[in-house]
Regions:
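C-terminal alpha-helical "lid/dimerization" subdomain adjacent to the S-adenosyl-L-methionine
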Residues: 5, 147-198, 208
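Hydrophobic beta-strand segment of the Class I
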Residues: 18, 111-112
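Conserved alpha-helix/loop element of class I SAM-dependent methyltransferases that forms part
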Residues: 26-44
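Class I SAM-dependent methyltransferase SAM/SAH-binding core
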Residues: 45-100
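A short acidic, Gly/Pro-enriched loop at the edge of an enzyme's catalytic core
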Residues: 99-110
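A short glycine-rich, Lys/Arg-flanked "PGG" loop and its adjoining helix->strand segment in the class I
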Residues: 124-136
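Conserved beta-strand signature within the Rossmann-like core of class I S-adenosyl-L-methionine
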Residues: 138-145
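Core SAM-dependent methyltransferase catalytic element
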Residues: 196, 203-224
Length: 224
């Protein structure tokens, strides 16, 4: 099975427990991380890629018109339901593949992807698509897990991340693979300078990154 289809099925299987597990496993820090990422977006029309259940899109809708996109129908269904229940009128949902976006060149003032870029089959292609659909002078924001830099904190965090988190995730979601996949995917993901170089290679400039919560996550920004 190709990685793309495997990932889609995995997220479809955990979609109903996804929000609860995000909050539980991050000890509530995920909300703070999303707020910080959204604060880096420009005002205007924003594309939320790999939107999942729509938390970033909902956060961004406070100051932006938002299009939430995801390739997993089950996730997008929850996203649409949450937006509707909150009475948000300036956000919409559309099924879309991060590696092959259906939007015209230069459609958006900004784009954001939170905890999704590491899951795409071709990271360079997804970044190039983000670059394509953002206007000249527009900005992109990427929020992703990182490996902590402090050696003392890192040791304890790795134990939690590799041993405890998958067990909790498996019990709550009743799915074996999803939360075992998370640690392995984070360990394989290019870190800080490495990912910044991928962004640069996709055409972005003025690339910066900000570590949050002892480097558990990193927010990357870049301009077109």
């Amino acid at each position: 099975m190709q990685k793309k289809e495997k990932i889609r099925k995995m997220f479809a299987g955990i979609s109903r427990r996804y929000d609860f597990l995000n909050c539980l496993l991050s000890l509530g820090q995920d909300r703070k991380w999303r707020r910080f990422a959204v604060s880096k977006l420009p005002e205007g029309l924003v594309l939320d890629i790999c939107s999942g259940t729509g938390d970033v899109a909902i956060e961004a809708s406070g100051k932006n018109d938002v299009v939430a996109s995801d390739f997993c129908y089950e996730m997008l269904e929850l996203c649409s339901s949450k937006i509707s229940k909150k009475g948000i009128l300036n956000a919409s949902c559309i099924r879309n593949d991060a590696e092959n976006l259906s939007f015209r060149d230069g459609t958006f003032d900004g784009a954001v992807v939170a905890f999704g870029i590491r899951n795409v089959a071709d990271i360079r292609k997804a970044l190039s698509e983000m670059h394509r659909v953002v206007k000249k002078g527009g900005k992109v924001v990427v929020l992703e897990f990182s490996r902590p830099t402090n050696p003392f904190f890192r040791a304890g965090y790795y134990f939690y991340f590799r041993k405890i988190l998958p067990v909790i995730g498996r019990i709550v979601s009743k799915k074996d693979g999803a939360y075992s996949y998370l640690p392995s995917s984070v360990m394989a993901f290019p870190q800080r300078d490495g990912f910044s170089k991928l962004m640069e290679g996709s055409g972005f400039s003025d690339i910066k990154y900000h570590d949050l919560t002892f480097g558990i996550v990193t927010v990357y920004t870049g301009s077109k």
